[in-house]
Amino acid sequence: MEKNIAHCPVEGNGEIENGASSSQNPESLEHSVLLSTSQTMPNNLGIRKNYKRAANRGKKGSQGLTGQAYTLMSSNSDVRVLRSTSSSKTTSTEHVQAPVQPAAKRRKMSRASNKSSTDEFSQIRKRVRYILNRMNYEQSLIEAYASEGWKNQSLDKIRPEKELERAKSEILRCKLRIREVFRNIDSLLSKGKIDETLFDSEGEISCEDIFCSTCGSNDATLGNDIILCDGACDRGFHQNCLNPPLRTEDIPMGDEGWLCPACDCKIDCIDLINELHGSNISIEDSWEKVFPDAAAMANDSKQDDAFDLPSDDSDDNDFDPNMPEEHVVGKDEESSEEDEDGGSDSDDSDFLTCSDDSEPLIDKKVDDLRLPSEDSEDDDYDPAGPDSDKDVEKKSSSDESDFTSDSDDFCKEISKSGHDEVSSPLLPDAKVGDMEKITAQAKTTSSADDPMETEIDQGVVLPDSRRRQAERLDYKKLYDEAYGEASSDSSDDEEWSGKNTPIIKSNEEGEANSPAGKGSRVVHHNDELTTQSTKKSLHSIHGSVDEKPGDLTSNGSNSTARKGHFGPVINQKLHEHFKTQPYPSRSVKESLAEELGLTFRQVNKWFETRRHSARVASSRKGISLDKHSPQNTNSQVTASMEPKEPEGTVVEESNVCLNGGTTISKEAVSSKVGSRTPGSDVGGSKVDSAEDQNPGPDLAEKARQKAIQQELRKKKMGR
């Protein structure tokens, strides 16, 4: 009966067919419709009270709502058709067009609202479906490399580890996005929700407490009644407030439930998740139950990131708000000193490599050292407090003590041999005036370091508060101390310096002018202009002057551990021990080292090189005795031992014992460079017929010079 009453305006189409009655009395038709609706209002209230919530919640009762929405449009099209037929039968169309135009406007507005509402929930469905497809794609990639395959053939595949990690992170991100979608749906369902306390134990609610969640009104009419959702939202909606509007005949009857569009969208998304992932999510579950494992993993990753950050808690044990900033700086400097202790040795070694040309280092200012200022106007000034300059001196003295502890052996050698390392070695042909100038400069430079020199003379090196100025060092000596001396067959190799390298020329005059000596020892005497510095330079180049003549070998080479390196007294004692015992025991070496102020390594190396030179000398002596007669040998050795001398110097050759009692001793005054002396050739050219007939020593000397040059090149490249 209600449906007939609701469709009473539609049944009036029979009156419209008459044409005249419908056109002449339109007001009477509208009046009759209003009377019929007013009479059915009490009946609608009774029907509203009889609505109960369905027992079987969760069932979708609006499966065909989308398809039935077109029936309403067809009814409107019928109205349009009826309007056209009535206008064709009657000549006046003014009364027919008046009530039809508002219906067209309402139809356009309903289309726009219908499109927006359906788009909102349809976009949610599409979004969830897209995210699930993305998850399936990434999961298939992981499973493709996780499976072993037929006969474990898939184990041989190259696994893209980075790609698999990216896939896992993408799956986690997709799960979090789905959780956000369900959270959005739950927020939509919470709008306009009826309080659960208004429902009784049977699930019924009074009609006075029901209101529309869209418009908020509790008024209901016959064709626009309020219907409750049987989902999880517990909300009510007017039939016309829904999008699309719900017709009365589409309302499910009996125990069949009805779902609002939001609950319908939620249950569709839940069905997709349950189908693809095998989960068991219901419509009454909240969004927190959707992929809870993904949320836990995300929280763990956030906590791990938070653990790496320093704490901002002011209750830390090492925090003292009353501590002044100066003490904090002092603690930082102490901690930095401990870290720098390990690298002090390397810093000291870098300091040793400084040259004399480098300017002295400028002391740091007080501000650079982060020390408190001593201004009396400062608030933190304490005249009775400790002096900061003394602390700096103590700190620098500790650094210097570390430096001196690494170079104790070096300082002992300086105290034994004097200050020979201050000035560079001089050439034998240098002028006397130049040597005096260099000696004066050395004295002036050494006078600036009087405190340090006195300490070195005493054999004790005390720390100094200021920076030490770098002196010229003998790097070859330092290299030999660190890596040991390389034994060679010639004294020129051991006594080599960077200023007396031989110059090789192609012509005979260049060979005559070559400064490469033949190994004899030179002593300058009866010359009043010769200074003590010249003797020291010749002493450092050609060996010890005080050594006995009998200590020379047949080839005139000083192949011991750098003659004059330890001083004449130490060398004399070492030679005496070597004559008595060439192979001393370890205890004897230790006693010698303790007695002479040397290290065990230096003493051991000296004996090794001395034995090697003795073996080489004996082997060469045997070769020369076999090939040459005694007379030729004496003349040849004497010629090979005589070096090139500067003009005006007197040369005295040492007595060389080769064949029993045969000795040669003579004096010669060297003339201009390239002149020949009787019995000897300065440039290496032949003089007498014996040497013309026996060119063996000259060839041997050339080969020896060539070997020396090759060895020097190797040492230069090795450094």
From Swiss-Prot:
This protein's GO CC annotations: nucleus
Polar residues bias locations: 111-120, 552-561, 630-639
Location of the region described as Disordered in the Swiss-Prot/TrEMBL record: 1-29, 76-120, 302-573, 612-650, 662-719
PROSITE patterns: HOMEOBOX_1, HOMEOBOX_2, ZF_PHD_1, ZF_PHD_2
Biased composition (Basic and acidic residues): 324-333, 361-373, 387-398, 409-422, 464-480
DNA-binding region residue numbers: 559-618
SUPFAM superfamilies from the UniProt entry: FYVE/PHD zinc finger (SSF57903), Homeodomain-like (SSF46689)
Domain of life of the native organism: Eukaryota
Compositionally biased residues, Low complexity: 84-93
UniProt xrefs under InterPro entries: HD, Homeobox_CS, Homeodomain-like_sf, PRHA-like_PHD-finger, Zinc_finger_PHD-type_CS, Znf_FYVE_PHD, Znf_PHD, Znf_PHD-finger
Biased composition (Acidic residues): 306-319, 334-360, 399-408
Cell location: Nucleus
MF (Gene Ontology): chromatin binding; DNA binding; DNA-binding transcription factor activity, RNA polymerase II-specific; zinc ion binding
GO biological process: negative regulation of gene expression, epigenetic
Gene3D superfamilies according to UniProt: Homeodomain-like, Zinc/RING finger domain, C3HC4 (zinc finger)
Protein name: Homeobox protein HOX1A
Organism: Zea mays (Maize)
